[in-house]
Amino acid sequence: MPELPEVEVTRQGIAPYLVEQTVIDLVIRNGSLRWPVPDIAKQIIGQVIRQVRRRAKYLLIDTDAGTSIVHLGMSGSLRILPHDTPVEKHDHIDLVLANGRILRFNDPRRFGAWLWCELPEEAHPLLAKLGPEPLTNAFNVKQLAAALTGKKKAIKLCLMDNHIVVGVGNIYANEALFAAGIHPEAEAGKIDIERLTVLVAEVKQILAHAIKQGGTTLKDFTNADGKPGYFAQKLHVYGRGGETCTSCGNLLSEIRLGQRTTVFCGICQTR
């Protein structure tokens, strides 16, 4: 599943081709995604795209009439292509631009979404209760400590809670906890401020580095230009259960936590 770095890399890839361009058509071949795709042709045709933003794992394509809210789901991708590019399997939506290009949404598993919001997007039900962005100053040790106060949940589950901080999915939660030396099952409310300070710094550093490297390539993710990400070569624990720890040589443990695979080093990461 694309996580925050992959979505940000996609945003950076498509924005230069979209901003200040006029929409001349919207082609919906299959509107049966995670939620039905609304028929917004009348609203969006003729509109100029003002900016392309990201909130958590959502891409926001702004026009004066409203905002398209796009989520890549488990396997979705957005590509900038010439108008006459042949349609392939799972190419569900084309946003057609006056500059001779299209923004094409492809999603084999159809867990993605393309929605429309005419209200301030912060009021949309999908966005209204989201926590702070991890790469902004709003995500800091004071905020995290307050959010974790009294919580008995495992710290990894809290890191992946979008009400606490957005966009830290399974890959980067595993990696950040390893880098911070914190066991993923550690009780969140009992982690001291010093360790939380390290954790916040590692979350920021790892996400920023993943964006710089072009995202993590697993089964489905490619950049907006079709190129793979390269951060998978840098993973220390995710997907490496049973292999040796890159720090101490101990065998990495693999468990299920919150229905997600969790990999950690029992020597380097403590409760």
Swiss-Prot record:
It comes from Shewanella sp. (strain W3-18-1). Monomer. The active site is at P2, E3, K57, R260. Keywords: DNA damage, DNA repair, DNA-binding, Glycosidase, Hydrolase, Lyase, Metal-binding, Multifunctional enzyme, Zinc, Zinc-finger. Involved in base excision repair of DNA damaged by oxidation or by mutagenic agents. Acts as a DNA glycosylase that recognizes and removes damaged bases. Has a preference for oxidized purines, such as 7,8-dihydro-8-oxoguanine (8-oxoG). Has AP (apurinic/apyrimidinic) lyase activity and introduces nicks in the DNA strand. Cleaves the DNA backbone by beta-delta elimination to generate a single-strand break at the site of the removed base with both 3'- and 5'-phosphates. DNA binds at H90, R109, K151. HAMAP family: Fapy_DNA_glycosyl (MF_00103). NCBIfam families: fpg, PRK01103.1. It catalyses: Hydrolysis of DNA containing ring-opened 7-methylguanine residues, releasing 2,6-diamino-4-hydroxy-5-(N-methyl)formamidopyrimidine; 2'-deoxyribonucleotide-(2'-deoxyribose 5'-phosphate)-2'-deoxyribonucleotide-DNA = a 3'-end 2'-deoxyribonucleotide-(2,3-dehydro-2,3-deoxyribose 5'-phosphate)-DNA + a 5'-end 5'-phospho-2'-deoxyribonucleoside-DNA + H(+). Binds 1 zinc ion per subunit. Its EC number is 3.2.2.23, 4.2.99.18. This is Formamidopyrimidine-DNA glycosylase. One of its GO terms (molecular function) is 8-oxo-7,8-dihydroguanine DNA N-glycosylase activity. It comes from the Bacteria. Pfam families: Fapy_DNA_glyco, H2TH, zf-FPG_IleRS. One of its GO terms (biological process) is base-excision repair. Its cofactor is Zn(2+). Belongs to the FPG family. A zinc finger (FPG-type) spans 236-270.
